[in-house]
A protein has these predicted regions:
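Pyridoxal 5′-phosphate
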Residues: 1-338
Length: 338
């Protein structure tokens, strides 16, 4: 079929926001300079765009200081930075039972270093009760790490209430916003978030290969930088700068990715995230209603749009899901993920 319908936005959004591709192409063709190194106008202009992108992200997540916006190659890198830069032998963390491998695999790697985790139980639809968190806190618990919304069933977790619990117990609170950023409002200060990890290529409608994290001042004092190298600042010293964002951004950052993300964020600011989210949920509600007319289909998670995002997973227990996905593309041009 010539017409294609893309249903894999939970993995990577497409199409991208307008001007993302053209802004990246223009940079690469007309002046792919570096920042913090060159003493010429093009480098200064590019540095201003990077600063503007930090400010856009600080506004998006209600962070008080754009210097606390750190760019990384993606959210997996960001979460590894947190887990491996914060935890020490004897530490314990709480994680949701819905976590992505970007959290679980690093934690499993650290098990041999006497670093342990406990999973917070969830109901069959992904619902997580805040009181379940409080009951699992130990004297050696250092942080709570959880996604904001499941990448499988779309269920939204109560991060505001859990953030309050973390504050009362003096725990660091880290939130993975891979699925929720660009869809719902996330207030880093109101939710008491110390570490907010984001990626550009999903709900933010930007390119792959660019992500990052926002960090609180309290956590910044505890987090160990994992990478050392050139920053374009204090180059006469063999010691890493101890100020943000340079402290966590060694090497050449992904400038084409940042410029593409800037274009995407500009689009989101103009279109309005609430309006975009409303449209997504209208379509999701219609999809859920119609899919329930198919008796062989099982919906993972919540059956309505209440407390969920536009991420829907289906199971057909009587059939091979891979064969269904193959048929959907070959016969109907519908691209899905199994």
């Amino acid at each position: 079929m010539n017409q294609k319908i893309y249903f894999d936005n939970g993995s990577t959004s497409w199409p991208k926001a307008p001007q993302v591709a053209s802004s990246m192409s223009e940079l690469l063709e007309s002046g792919a300079f570096n920042i913090n190194r060159g003493n010429y106008e093009g480098a200064y202009e590019l540095e201003s765009l990077v600063l503007l992108t930090r400010m856009q992200l600080a506004r998006l997540f209600h962070a008080p200081d754009s210097r606390h916006v750190i760019f990384t190659p993606g959210i997996t890198y960001s979460l590894n930075y947190l887990i491996k830069g914060l935890l020490r032998p004897g530490d314990h963390v709480l994680v949701s039972s819905l976590e992505h491998n970007a959290v679980m695999r690093p934690l499993c790697q650290l098990a041999s270093q006497d670093i342990h985790y406990t999973m917070i139980p969830a109901e069959t639809d992904g619902t997580t009760q805040p009181e379940s968190v409080e009951a699992l806190i130990r004297p050696e618990t250092k942080a709570v790490i959880m996604l904001h919304a499941s990448n499988v069933c779309g269920t939204i977790l109560p991060i505001r209430e859990i953030g309050d619990i973390c504050r009362r117990h003096h725990l660091f609170f880290a939130v993975d916003t891979a699925q929720s950023a660009g869809s719902v409002d996330i207030d880093m200060q109101e939710c008491n978030i110390d570490f907010l990890a984001f990626t550009g290529h999903k709900g933010l409608l930007g390119p792959q290969g660019i992500g990052g994290f926002l960090i609180s001042e309290a956590l910044d004092h505890e987090l160990t930088p994992l990478i050392a190298g050139g920053t374009g600042s204090q180059s006469d010293s063999l010691l890493m700068p101890d100020y943000l964002p340079d402290k966590y951004e060694s090497g050449t950052i992904n400038l084409p990715g940042i410029i593409g993300l800037h274009a995407a964020l500009t689009y989101l600011e103009e279109a309005g995230i609430p309006a975009i989210h409303q449209k997504k949920m209208e379509l999701t509600g219609y999809f859920l209603k119609r899919i329930q007319e198919i008796p062989q289909a099982h919906i993972a998670g919540k059956q309505t749009i209440q407390d969920r995002l536009a991420v829907v997973s289906l199971d057909f227990p009587e059939y091979d899901n891979a064969e269904i996905a193959f048929s959907l593309e070959q016969d109907y041009g519908i691209m899905t993920r199994v």
